[in-house]
Amino acid sequence: MIIIAKTINYTQEQSIICMKAVEITDIYLQSFADKNTNKKIQYKINDKWFDFDGIRERQAVLPDSLFSRYMYSSLTRIKNSDIYSNFLTVRTSYNVTYRDHEGDKKGVPVSCNDLRNQYYKDGIDYTFIVRNRKGEEIGKITKHFVMLMRNPSKAKKGECIFIEESLFLKAIRFLTMGLYDKMKEQYENAPDTLFNIVGMSAYQTLTTAAAGDGYIQIPLNNILIIKDREVLSDPMKAAVVKSVPVQYRKFEIDFDDPKVEKIINRHDCTFDPETAKEKGCTLIGKSREDLSANGIRVNGKYPGEYHYVDDEKRKQCTVVRADDYEIPNILWDGQGLCDSSIMPEGAEGFIYCRSHFFKSCLFAGNIQEFFKDYCVEHGIDYKTATTEKTDMFKRKLKLCDIKAVISDKSIKWLKFVDLMGGKESKTFRYWRNFMKEHGNWFEIVKTVHHSKLGEYQKSAYQMNNSVPSTDRSILQSVANCSIEYYNLLKNNDAEYLKYLEMMKNRFNINEVLLAMVGWNSDFTKTELFREKKSKDLNKLKNEMMAGRLWQKADNLTIMDNPISMLLTAVGDKAPLNEECFSVMADGVQCYTPKFKDGERLAAFRNPHNSPNNIIHLYNVYPEKLLKYFPDIGENIIVFNAIGTDTQARLNSQDCDSDFVYVTNQSELAELARIAYVEYPTIINAVEEKGVSEYHFCPEDFAKMDNAISAAQISIGVSTDLAQMALSYYYAGKMKSRELEDIFIILSVIGQISIDLAKKNFDINVVNEINRIKRLSCMKSGLVPRFMADAKKIKNPKKKYSEGTVQRMNCPMDIMAEIMEEETIQYPDRVSRMLLRDLFDKDLKKIKADNRKIDNLVELVRGYNDTMKDIRTDYGLDEEDKAYYELKNRVLDKTLKKFGRIDKDGNTNLDQIVVVHLTLMAMRDSNSDVRNTILNFLYQMAPELFLKCFVKNEQK
């Protein structure tokens, strides 16, 4: 089914679509309470019972995207609210036990899996409260919602989006390009048919990604599609992870032993036909099944012996080491190239684009210049040259019209050829027509964004704890950059002001402090400034000691062999001979303008589990890359993926905007070389089970999401478990092959857990993790100090059993000790003064409307409470885009109220109000809201705010 799209203006800004967010357990408890209005419903957390007071409503956002713009005209906003009543975010994050009377000590348990099954099948009835401007209830709206899609960025938290039933078909047909209808029709005609709903559920959400950097329109006739290419490395060391049947001990009865005949004779049975005739016994076969069928129990009295037997239904991982393994790379997996002429204003280096069943990272280069030069060198007429020999679908496109080149890995609809016509050519036409109907628009999910930390970038504890050394002098050098930077900030206010500039945002007080110091340099002596600096540096040191070390480094987006890709595009006979890189024995050649020609580099990619994932790089400056990709900038790195192991080495890396943390720190570069040579590259050889395990029905969608949710949790668990195994390995002087196997296997388990949203594998990741936990070398459960500290920074409520957390002789704990010893404990003494000492004394005499001041202070308190709720109740990480979208929305609404203009044209913030709010903020009783008040005043009335204080020359 092709959907006729109405014209959408993608150049116009669209407001955020806000929706209610609820827990599925609250929905269930509310429905139970509605049926039992005369009973008090309670639910249990740990061992304590709580009264159920109704559904806890939060807010979520549907970001600006192709999907949200398509749906926008059909959406309805609740009166006097910015909440839309057409979507409902539902989190399935915990099981619940409830009861309807206090005498019930155990309660009734209900699992997330059961609730998914119920609500995916039956949908959800949800009631919205309508309020007037005073917040008073004036009505209710009840709507029926049905499951639409998993939230791709929140799969780990078990989050999905339900949609108003009347809009379901419009939405699902857009998301699936009409393939939903085709699947449904096939299912109704043949209910036993199995479908790739795993892939469909993953790829239908591509048009829902936030268009953080706008949109771009590229006609498909300007896009050349080539087939990717598998290339093999030179023979090298590898650690191959395979799945093998779980073995168990099985007792095999020796049925030929005369003792067995005597035992069964007592039950009037026999194996001997003659005995059966003579004594009238029942003749049975020699098997356990025959014994059981005749009521004969098997116990320890039977003769026989134990054997190890394979259980073909249960698999576990094993590591097989090889010295001459040819490791495959898939060239240009998710990568595309675009001519620099089509790069949108403000975009740099690349544009990561998504559209209908499409995602590709388009790197900017002079591709038309390359085509011209190639044609001249090979005697081809550039203006008439066509692409029917190189285009995957044999399209005869003019080479001079090509604006982008992509590989087939970027087009995900190839996985559904059977639904789209049965042939790839028909499938392409289906996609082309759908894209044309919707204007050939692509959302730009991201482009290059430079580090706000300037020449620095933070690393992660997973990286630092994997470097293959426990030598204190070497690790001292690795930690020195962080130590020196911290000490510089400690005793240098000018450097700390630069730090404030780097870390400023709309929500903190950094910009206020910078403005105040610019107004009067004595502000650096105030308690406000000194306390903020002390708090910031304590936080910085704690983060560093927990693994967030600073290095002169950056996160660089990966591109593979673009010259080879262009040679393939023009049909060159030897496209792998691009004359850019050489194969090295102890590393991989690369090109990035970020570092100098000839420098050695260390690179790490997230997810990162072990030294087997570290890559050693040699930076070179190939002439062809300098000529045809002159503007890629310092945030892109070109890998040589031909004849190397880059993708497996970097934990299943591809080129659809994957990035690596890269540094030229000399000790890290040498440790990377050692790791690359001594720790074999991990190969994920666990077999896929196929994709067609499910029927096209709500119950199977729930079954799939239950499995995916369980596996997603395993991503973090496998990473943590790998760090524990790695720490034990280093503490044991790097000798245990068993521990080495564990962090190798867990690296693969992490890969599989991520891919389970799209594929099925011949291993149960939860069972495998539990098996590893039970191994004798892991049973202690000891947690290295740095790891416990990192967890507590993220979740201050995190607790460990007494004696569980220990300092270990592992790289990160050693570096944390070094930092504790080498960092300055106490800063140089500075004379302090109170903030009120710098206040303009003449302004203190002005009288104000105290009621208005009190109302504004309470508004600020409410804002602070809401901000805490967003982090704690919503379970969002600070890096989460939704976290900032929600925070921005709350801040904008509060600032609007804070500086509101009344019907007479009077603003809340005149000089009198600003003066007295500033005085209120300086009171000790208002220390909890001080920073927020000052931040609001500076954002809304910067000049009036600064005039509250004396300038330097007025002293």
What kind of feature is each model-predicted range?
Residues M1-G633, I637-S652, F659, T663-K955:
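Beta-strand-enriched accessory nucleic-acid recognition/scaffold domains that flank the catalytic cores
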